[in-house]
Amino acid sequence: MEEHTEAGSAPEMGAQKALIDNPADILVIAAYFLLVIGVGLWSMCRTNRGTVGGYFLAGRSMVWWPVGASLFASNIGSGHFVGLAGTGAASGLAVAGFEWNALFVVLLLGWLFAPVYLTAGVITMPQYLRKRFGGRRIRLYLSVLSLFLYIFTKISVDMFSGAVFIQQALGWNIYASVIALLGITMIYTVTGGLAALMYTDTVQTFVILGGACILMGYAFHEVGGYSGLFDKYLGAATSLTVSEDPAVGNISSFCYRPRPDSYHLLRHPVTGDLPWPALLLGLTIVSGWYWCSDQVIVQRCLAGKSLTHIKAGCILCGYLKLTPMFLMVMPGMISRILYPDEVACVVPEVCRRVCGTEVGCSNIAYPRLVVKLMPNGLRGLMLAVMLAALMSSLASIFNSSSTLFTMDIYTRLRPRAGDRELLLVGRLWVVFIVVVSVAWLPVVQAAQGGQLFDYIQAVSSYLAPPVSAVFVLALFVPRVNEQGAFWGLIGGLLMGLARLIPEFSFGSGSCVQPSACPAFLCGVHYLYFAIVLFFCSGLLTLTVSLCTAPIPRKHLHRLVFSLRHSKEEREDLDADEQQGSSLPVQNGCPESAMEMNEPQAPAPSLFRQCLLWFCGMSRGGVGSPPPLTQEEAAAAARRLEDISEDPSWARVVNLNALLMMAVAVFLWGFYA
């Protein structure tokens, strides 16, 4: 047992802040923001933002490399920098399995799911289920669930992670910094639409990878190279192991020594912190929900100009997903080696002084490396990287939640809303999300940081598997109907809540102060629970479907995988609703078909014209495309739903997919 060091000599949170107050850092940060704003303005000028398809799907004009870069940048938020590095510092390499699992799942998106979404002619995922099953309750349920998850989990994680970095690296006021960050993000999200997001995502992907590569180089140099990491990590333990609290006292070495299996991706199926069956199967289920049916991700794919470009973008994203192991997880482990008394603190009162929370300070691993290792200028670059990740992730949530609310909820309230009204509501929803985000900041700041990364994974495991099951069955089992899908979702939700509510009521605890949640409620690993929940939801869906009337085949053409190439006319189950509405976009028709006949208004003033252009709502004028005829609109709709591929390029992307899977299998085996 280590000797107790005097509490007063423990590192203080305030003593280790490195303020960005030198000209080099400020210049780099300013240049970065000018670059992002410039790219956003450029995309505003060159893209069509005045229509629903142009704003929400970038007009289906994106080539493969911005699609892939945007998929990666939308997925990699500041939560990855803080969370992956922090979990790597705490338990070793296994957390990289969350990233490398996605290599295979993103291929499922490009090859199996995206073709059906395209031929269905949809903008949102609940909209697909509305076409597939009919009825309103599934679509409304998924829209509300998705918005709930966006606001209270994704935004929470990004906000907390950004706050940790700002606290540790800058010393700025948290609220002023995050509000300014949200403001800039909101400006180019509200004004630019999806095309602006995808172009800025592409720029930020290079910023993220470049800055993280530089820090990785500094970190490996400091620790003595790749071999130095694996030689020293198992000995990286804090010297502060005795608490002043008599209830805690001497802390067991089990709580502050690195795990013996820290270097293994695949761990013991019972005693491992990430059991290998759960990592391979349970994580695939949760990842399937995120990569194949989550609005943030799928919306990027639907913007690809062709199915081949979509597949190539998925491959590029997969290759980029190889990098977090080396750019985030291993630097987090190095941070524990270099600063064990801070990053690996275990005494509650010491941890509170170091990072403000008692359960541990592994979340400061990445910010600590930036503060300690990076020289002036490069430290500003790394701040820009973190801001890029945070802004990209938040902007994705803002845009996608705006799409969900506008197309799936608002059109239920105002079925005859015109194109301009929908665009205005979509932008106002973004403003509302920003207000909610800022109001949520005190809750995020008060949360125990050591539990936040596990929190987001656990919440996903309790709520996502029923959605995954329904989407898989919807695409691949034509016999599944609306009753089965709805009751499968509801039954799965009740099962998930039965695990989620007691676990978070009791708290997840820590090694020093374990949770009081009974083992029969909380003892099963959350990824194992995801497997059980997935199969129970799927079984309930199939059982109810087989006991009720099937959906006639005439309603399923190009809505299930086996009928994706069908040329027969489809009778949409939501046709009656669409005929009563003036919104052909709900049937996949192009945005121009949505224009409503409105009385001719007097010419707006110059100020009003500028304001309408800035918000992407101007009509007519120089450079505006003429309205499409009915024949042109039908041709555009067919192009949006086209999944034909050039055979030679199809073979190229297929071979690249096989190559990427081979690389992934090798890396899994090497680190298993």
Swiss-Prot record:
Residues 1-22, 86-93, 167-173, 218-275, 332-375, 447-451, 506-523, 671-672 are extracellular. Residues 45-63, 115-136, 296-309, 407-424, 478-482, 548-651 are cytoplasmic. One of its GO terms (cellular component) is apical plasma membrane. It is a multi-pass membrane protein. Enhanced by the interaction with PDZK1IP1/MAP17. Inhibited by natural product phlorizin and diabetic drugs, including empagliflozin and dapagliflozin, canagliflozin, and sotagliflozin. Empagliflozin is selective for SLC5A2/SGLT2 over SLC5A1/SGLT1 and it inhibits by occupying the sugar-binding site in SLC5A2. Changing residue 74 to A: Impairs phlorizin binding and its inhibition on glucose uptake. Disulfide bonds join 255-511, 345-351, 355-361, 517-522. It is found in: Apical cell membrane. Belongs to the sodium:solute symporter (SSF) (TC 2.A.21) family. Electrogenic Na(+)-coupled sugar symporter that actively transports D-glucose at the plasma membrane, with a Na(+) to sugar coupling ratio of 1:1. Transporter activity is driven by a transmembrane Na(+) electrochemical gradient set by the Na(+)/K(+) pump. Unlike SLC5A1/SGLT1, requires the auxiliary protein PDZK1IP1/MAP17 for full transporter activity. Has a primary role in D-glucose reabsorption from glomerular filtrate across the brush border of the early proximal tubules of the kidney. Forms a heterodimer (via TM13) with PDZK1IP1 (via N-terminal transmembrane helix); this interaction enhances SLC5A2 transporter activity. This is Sodium/glucose cotransporter 2. The gene is SLC5A2.
